[in-house]
Amino acid sequence: MVLDSGTQVYEQAPPRPPAGSPSQHHKLKPSNGNGPPLYPWPESLGMPLALAVPSALQQQTMWQTFSKLHLEQSSHMRRSESTYSVNSTGRRGRGKAPIGRGCDPGGTLRPAASLPHIAKIRKDVGSSSSKSPCMLVALRPTNMDQEREKFFQSHYTYNPQFEYQEPMPMSVLEKYQEASAQFMNQAVGIIEAVLEKFGTYENFEAATGGQLLTKCQIWSTVRKYMQKEGCVGEIVVQLSEDLLSQAVMMVENSRPTLAINLTGARQYWLEGMLRHEIGTHYLRGVNNSRQPWHSTEGRLQYGLQPANPTEEGLASLHSVLFRKQPFLWRAALLYYTIHQAAHMSFRQLFQDLAQYVQDEGVRWEYCVRAKRGQTDTSQPGCFSKDQVYLDGILRILRHRHTIDFQLLTSLGKVSYEDVEQLRPYGVLDNTRVPHFMKDLERYRQQLEHIMTTNRLDEAELGRLLPD
C-alpha cells in the first residue's frame, strides 16, 4: 500500500521565504537531473504530481515515484520514502534554516466527469528505462513464485534463495538493514489486544474486513469516495492480484493511477484504503506541488525534516479511522515481523509468526516483505522500511492534541514538527483537505478511540517520545 516525502519530480529552486508575506505560486519545470523527461502533464489536472511505483507494476512506460528521494543520483523510491530512520530518537537532521475487480477491462481513458477507469494490470514487465531501478522493483524477487513452491513443499524447512532483476541498490539496503525495538511493547500489545478479542487473525479479518469485493463493487466504492473528495476523473483505477501491498499510487502515461490488490479489497476495509491512498497521499501530493518547498532545494532552504514518518503514520491512522474497532494490527505486525527478521532466518521467522497468524499464505507475505533485498534468507537480516507505519502512528498520537491537522495536510508533504515554522510561508489558496478531516471535533474523537482500542498509554508514549 503506496509507497516520499520530500521532494517533487518537477524541481526548481524556490524563492527565499519572504519576511512577512505569504508565499506565491511557482511554475514547475521538469528536472533534468533525474532520469528521462516526464510525459507532458494534462492541463486539466493543474499542478503535476508524482506517485508511487508498485513492485509488480513496472512496465516499459516510465514511472515516477510520489515525491522522489535522491538515494543516489537518480534512483527512485516509493512515494513516502524519506531519509528518516526509524531507529533514531529525538530530532532528525535538518537542512539550512529559512533565509527569511471487471466492469470495463482495458480500453481508453474516460473523460474527467465519468467513472474511474478500471484496467487489469499487465504482467509484461520490461526492463526499466531509468538509469536506476525503482526500489520496489529492485527489491522484488523475480523467482518468488518458484521459491514459494519450494518453501511450501519442504513443509516450511527451506530458506528461499531469492533472485532480483536489477543490481541491489546498496545505499538502500544499508539504510534499512537495522531494525528498531523502540516500539516493540506497543506492537506486541496491539497484536495481543486483537487476539484477546477475536481469538485468531482469521477471525479478526472475517469480523472486521467483511467479504472480498467484486470488481464492480470496488468500482462503485471508489467512485463514491472520489465524489466525496471532489476528484472524480482525476485518478485512473487499476486492479491487480500481484501487489505485495494492498494498494499503491503511481503515474502511468502521465495519469495519476491507483492500483488496488484484488486479494485484499474487503467490504469494510476498502474505504480506509482509499482514505490512506487518496485522502492522504494523493491530496497531500497535490498540496505539496503548490508549495515553495516542493523541490529538493526548497526543502533544504526551508530546513525541512523528512516527511516520514509523518506521511505514512497519518495515512495509516486514516486507514482505520471511523472503524468501530480500529485496531492497528497491520502496522503492529509489520513492526514486530521486521524486528524478528533481523535475528532470524526466513523459516524461523515463518514459524515465529505462527503464534499470531495461522494462515500460511499471510505469513509468507509478511516474511517476504521483511526479507526483501536478501538473496540467502537462511541468514538473519531485514528490510526495515515497513516499521515506519507504526513509528509514524505513535508519533502523531503522542502529539495529537497540538497538531494542526488541516494545516498539516494543506502544507503538503511535511512533518508535523515543521508545521508551525512553515505557517507564514504556506500557499493555502485552493489547497485541498480530505472530507473526513473537515469536522475536526469528530476527527479528534476518532483519534482518542484509536488510542483506547489499541491500549496505548499516554504516559508511556510521553516517556518514549519526550518533547
From Swiss-Prot:
Q: Look up the record and name the cofactor or cofactors this protein needs.
A: Zn(2+)
SMART domains on file: DUF1704
Q: Which GO terms describe its biological process?
A: brain development; proteolysis
Q: What does this protein do?
A: Tyrosine carboxypeptidase that removes the C-terminal tyrosine residue of alpha-tubulin, thereby regulating microtubule dynamics and function. Also able to remove the C-terminal phenylalanine residue of alpha-tubulin TUBA8. Recognizes adjacent tubulin dimers along the same protofilament.
Q: Give the primary localization class.
A: cytoplasm
Domain notes for this protein: Metalloprotease with an atypical HExxxH zinc-binding motif instead of HExxH, which interrupts the active site-containing helix without affecting the integrity of the catalytic site arrangement. The N-terminal disordered region enhances its anchoring on microtubules, while dampening processivity on the polymerized substrate.
Note on cofactor: Binds 1 zinc ion per subunit.
Q: What is the lineage of its organism?
A: Eukaryota, Metazoa, Chordata, Craniata, Vertebrata
Active-site residues are: E277
Keyword Calcium in the entry? The reply is no
Return the protein name.
Microtubule-associated tyrosine carboxypeptidase 1
Question: What's in the GO CC field?
Answer: cytoplasm; microtubule
Note the superkingdom of the native organism: Eukaryota
Q: Where, by residue number, does Zn(2+) bind? A: H276, H281, E312
Please provide, alphabetically and separated by semicolons, the GO molecular function terms listed in this UniProt record.
metal ion binding; metallocarboxypeptidase activity; tubulin-tyrosine carboxypeptidase
**UniProt feature, compositional bias: Polar residues:** 1-10
Q: Tell me its family.
A: Belongs to the peptidase MATCAP family.
Could you tell me which residues belong to the region Disordered?
1-40, 77-111
Q: Which UniProt keywords apply?
A: Carboxypeptidase, Cytoplasm, Cytoskeleton, Hydrolase, Metal-binding, Metalloprotease, Protease, Zinc
Catalyses: C-terminal L-alpha-aminoacyl-L-glutamyl-L-glutamyl-L-tyrosyl-[tubulin] + H2O = C-terminal L-alpha-aminoacyl-L-glutamyl-L-glutamyl-[tubulin] + L-tyrosine; C-terminal L-alpha-aminoacyl-L-glutamyl-L-glutamyl-L-phenylalanyl-[tubulin] + H2O = C-terminal L-alpha-aminoacyl-L-glutamyl-L-glutamyl-[tubulin] + L-phenylalanine
Q: What is its EC number?
A: 3.4.17.17
Cystine bridges: none
Localization of this protein: Cytoplasm, Cytoskeleton
Null mutant: what phenotype? No visible phenotype: mice are viable and fertile and display no gross alterations. Mice lacking both Matcap1 and Svbp are viable but show a reduction in brain volume: microcephaly is associated with proliferative defects during neurogenesis and abnormal behavior. Cells lacking both Matcap1 and Svbp show abolished tubulin detyrosination.
